[in-house]
Amino acid sequence: PIFSVSPADRAIVVTTPHVSAIHDARRCISLLDSAHLDDISVIVNAYDKHMVRRHQMISDNDITALLSTRIIGTIPYDKSVIICQNRGIPVREAKSRLGPVFARISGQIIHSSDDMRGAAV
């Protein structure tokens, strides 16, 4: 599995703020580190800030500390995603607050890729 990332210059690990998922993300990041991949970042999916405030979910700051990796995006929990999946409708077509979130994260990924290409020239 490590050989499959050898041509990559970056990796984005997507996880959820659940203990088992953070454990799996840490193992994945460790494998990517052993493949000498330097640019590793994380996207946190299904994040519920209300649960974080009630200490029922791991915070994004704790995730950053546990994974020793920067978070480039946090996607809030939104039940409309489940409804869209069950109906076969793209999330971007639903009346959801996630459209701008996905646009911001994808823009950040694209711009950081452009910055990396510019630095290599």
Language model feature labels by segment:
Residues 101-116:
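C-terminal alpha-helix
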Residues 84-85, 105:
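Conserved N-terminal glycine/acidic-rich loop preference
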Residues 117-121:
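Short, charged juxtamembrane terminal tails flanking transmembrane helices
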Residues 85-98:
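C-terminal boundary of histidine-terminating zinc-finger modules
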Residues 24, 97, 101:
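Charged catalytic carboxylate motif
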